[in-house]
């Protein structure tokens, strides 16, 4: 029931975003549109931005399910970009309504979790300092988030599959090369 209520609030938020900007939507607007009381909203979320973050995390978690390995990261990122494109109105309105820092922090957390999993997988059998693995994951995190934000900022015109293909071509084998260069057991 709890997840259903959260999803209903997200659906109401998306409907309301079609009518007005995020900063003009109130909790009262949301709860009246959704047919729940304000206490129900506050039981689940501290504010509207918390609801936005939950909606983004929920969408990304669904897109990344089972796609956190070296062989599948491309599919995971493709599914994220496709989900973003599918929700273009929501994403664009949110992108232009809240601080870039808020969006970046969310994307950084999401992308780091994916990349550190890939780095750890490729580092199996190597002795690499944890801070070097983190540095490699952070490097790719910043690259992917920068590309994603630029893609959103420019209206999501590029085909997500073509974008992922270009990124994949650029980094093919580079994570392993970076780990090899950082090995302390050579």
Named regions from a protein language model:
Residues 74-89, 138, 146, 161:
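Amphipathic alpha-helical segments that line or abut small-molecule/effector binding pockets
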């Amino acid at each position: 029931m709890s997840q259903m209520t959260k999803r209903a609030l997200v659906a109401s938020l998306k409907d309301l975003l079609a009518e007005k900007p995020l900063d003009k939507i109130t909790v009262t607007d949301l709860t009246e549109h959704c047919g729940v009381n304000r206490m129900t909203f506050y039981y689940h979320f501290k504010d509207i931005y918390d609801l936005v973050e939950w909606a983004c995390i929920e969408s990304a978690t669904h897109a990344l399910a089972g796609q956190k390995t070296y062989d599948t990261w491309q599919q995971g990122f493709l599914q994220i970009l496709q989900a973003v494109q599918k929700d273009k109105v929501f994403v664009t309105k949110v992108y232009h309504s809240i601080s870039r820092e808020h969006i970046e922090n969310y994307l950084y957390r999401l992308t780091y979790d994916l990349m550190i999993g890939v780095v750890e997988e490729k580092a199996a059998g190597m002795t690499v300092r944890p801070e070097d693995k983190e540095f490699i994951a952070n490097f790719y995190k910043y690259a992917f988030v920068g590309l994603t934000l630029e893609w959103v900022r420019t209206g999501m015109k590029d085909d997500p599959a073509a974008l992922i293909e270009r990124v994949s071509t650029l980094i093919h084998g580079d994570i392993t090369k970076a780990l090899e260069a950082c090995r302390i057991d050579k």
